[in-house]
Amino acid sequence: MFDGFSIVKNESFNVLDKYVGNLNKVAVAFSGGKDSTALALLLLDWVLERGRSDLDITLVHSNTLSEIPEMEFWAKKFMEVYKDYARKNVGVKVDFIVTKPKPIDTFFWRVLVRGYVAPTFSFRWCVELLKRQPSKEALSRVGDIPILLGHRDDESGFRVSTLNRRGMVCPLATGRCYAYYYNVDGNNIKVYPIRSWRATHVWDYLRLWRTKIEYLDRLFQLYLYGTLPVRYGCWHCTLVKKQMTHYILGKNYLYLEATRILFRWLSDLTWMRIPKDKGYSRLGPLTPAARAIMARLIQVTEKLSGIKFYGLDESEIEGYSLRQIFFEISPQEANNLIQRIEQRHIERSPWRFTEIENIRNIGKHKEYVLRFVEHVNEKAKHVDEEVREYIVTVINSVVE
């Protein structure tokens, strides 16, 4: 551990002194990534050093139902390990708040039922529905206690610009004033104790904990022991050119990468979009043919990879999982359920919706499907060789 780390750690402790101080409750936003994990452990360090075993900690975890499965499994397990360690070794109580999007806000519902296309930087629908809205609900349950977040300036430029827009800048050097680490968002006090940390600080700090919590080894494996700038997130994210996590988790995950790419390509085709007569873009939602392709891609990808999209099983409407609604129950039952749930939107925009038979029966769209397969096989010639064969395998399996 190099000397510079002691400086940033002391800064973080000072921030906790300032904003947690003598409070008896605090919340930590825990995604399961390296930064939020380091922050959660830093809080235990602070509790021990300051003798604050009277502090109650709440881990707030937002499950998008679209996370890379391995990361979501890690996050759920680590929260239990953290709670047990905190109770036995630190003497503090740890609770959880786990939120997830409403079933009708999930990736699967929005794409298959409403025909949402792959997000762009000007239409980040996934961020709002899968992350922000569930997070707001979680924050309302937290109350008026501070919530600690693991955002760092060493991360993406988008996150840094977001923090700066909220006034979280300091006219002096980093660490010289507390405005740099703090802001008020509505009724919530948000604190960023490790904002000035670099990635090397995070990994050095996590290494200190590996001897205390063996399960941290799994986090190191997921991040290739800190050797690559890997970021975890939704498996279907098209806001990145390359989802690096699919490449490092094993070849089976390259089937997910192939489907992610195919979703982007499908969304970009004008003849796979329903035209609109108003609005900024005249390209509307995915056509029934495009939705049928997406439904088949989901099934094919699960079969080829052996990886289940857990969001299909963990989200229910009227006692049915999304998997049952989209693929298993009778078409009449599925249509009736969707019509009840979407009645208001169907009345307002009937052209956006289609019956479940048109999504399940890909044979109804043979002309468009074959045209898309031809398009993909040609386009795949120009992509990364490592994923090319997976794209070709997946798309050709759609028509088998």
Language model segments and positions:
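ATP-dependent adenylation/nucleotidyltransferase module used to activate substrates
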Residues: M1-T200, L206, I395-E400
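ATP/NTP-dependent adenylation/nucleotidyl-transfer catalytic domains that generate, transfer
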Residues: D17, N24, L208-E400
